Amino acid sequence: MEALLSSTTLQLKPLHPPSSFSSLHSPFSSISVLRVKGSKKAETFIQRSNFSTVLPLRVSASSQAAAAETSTSISIPSEMKAWSYTDYGSVDVLKLESNVAVPDIKEDQVLIKIVAAALNPVDFKRRLGKFKATDSPLPTVPGYDVAGVVVKVGSQVKGLKEGDEVYGDIHEKALDGPKQFGSLAEYTAVEEKLVALKPKNLSFAEAAALPLAIETAYEGLEKAGFSSGKSILVLGGAGGVGSLVIQLAKHVFGASKVAATSSTGKLELLKSLGADLAIDYTKENFEDLPDKFDVVYDSVGQGEKAVKVVKEGGSVVVLTGAVTPPGFRFVVTSNGEMLKKLNPYLESGKVKPVIDPKGPFSFDKVVDAFSYLETGRATGKVVIHPIP
């Protein structure tokens, strides 16, 4: 940490999040919370490590819970098409399989016929084997974000029925044993509590672009203590998370001022999302701005610079970066209740998904979609649609 703020002697103490944070957890990664104390100021750092199903191609009986006793009026095949990998590695390990077993559901789950999915950095980092220690066994069908139609419900499911159009992040814990069955398939099984009814005004492709990114954006703002009347600087405002941070800060939390950075060609997008100040990082250094901000939300990994523009006592949310002891780590979780909470803002159009103009990518172009995502140049989300 001395390298991060070389002019300041730092003392780190772990923060214990208030109980009010427990209800709306982000599935994006684990979060570490550090309080940094200097001689003149204190900032709070929330650092995230970006981290991403059965192929029973076959899963042993011990690895799957007994299927729920359910019935369905919808015809469901025994096998499906799905993208999978049996070894960790580059995009070359991804294979499109046509005889993957459709997953069974547990009593608290629904089976979703997937219409659209979206990719996140966690997906390719998981594929690269960054999280082997806590990953589910190979083979893996990747994918977190999903939008589709419920075709079967478990015996304990109360709030959803066959035919409901839903969306969500299917992995309750992003890093701790995520499912083998992800969303890059024709079907997936997911707990009822992790999904919500799709906003009526959104297409399946638009809905699939939201879950992981909007939960990450909302969670970061909440944990940073952001509230009405505060100012925020968003680094990487045109990305999947950054584009939603701008909108949530402005239209949900009531920010007094929203500034954001992007390349030259994306400045108008920032303004359309609600940014009061759009900064071209190819021509300007945001750390030279005359004003400081209550919160800096760093989605691109510029923590050293971010701390230079935060107010005394302000907060910095960082989506990339190592945890420095004695900071502690805890795993955040997906929660459909948060999606329900944001539904009015989505259906009113105050908060909108941003889909990269190169997409949506068709289901047979998943390798191209991964390759594009890994360039780091995507605007908004990389979406896969339709999924046959």
Swiss-Prot record:
Residues binding substrate, per UniProt = K125
Protein keywords: Chloroplast, NAD, NADP, Oxidoreductase, Plastid, Transit peptide
Q: Which Gene3D superfamilies match?
A: Medium-chain alcohol dehydrogenases, catalytic domain (3.90.180.10), NAD(P)-binding Rossmann-like Domain (3.40.50.720)
Function summary: Enone oxidoreductase involved in the biosynthesis of 4-hydroxy-2,5-dimethyl-3(2H)-furanone (HDMF or furaneol). Can use both NADH and NADPH as the electron donor.
Catalytic reactions on record: 4-hydroxy-2,5-dimethyl-furan-3(2H)-one + NADP(+) = 4-hydroxy-5-methyl-2-methylenefuran-3(2H)-one + NADPH + H(+)
> Quaternary structure?
Monomer.
Q: What InterPro entries does its record include?
A: ADH-like_N (IPR013154), AOR-like (IPR044626), GroES-like_sf (IPR011032), NAD(P)-bd_dom_sf (IPR036291), PKS_ER (IPR020843), Quin_OxRdtase/zeta-crystal_CS (IPR002364)
Question: One GO MF term, please?
Answer: zinc ion binding
> Principal localization?
plastid
Which family is this sequence assigned to?
Belongs to the zinc-containing alcohol dehydrogenase family. Quinone oxidoreductase subfamily.
Entry protein name: 2-methylene-furan-3-one reductase
Q: Which GO terms describe its biological process?
A: alkaloid metabolic process
Q: Does the keyword Disulfide bond apply?
A: no
Membrane-spanning ranges:
none
List the source organism.
Answer: Solanum lycopersicum
Kindly give the Pfam families that the UniProt entry links to this protein.
ADH_N (PF08240), ADH_zinc_N_2 (PF13602)
Q: What class of enzyme is it?
A: oxidoreductase
What residues span the transit peptide?
A: 1-60
Record's GO cellular component terms: chloroplast
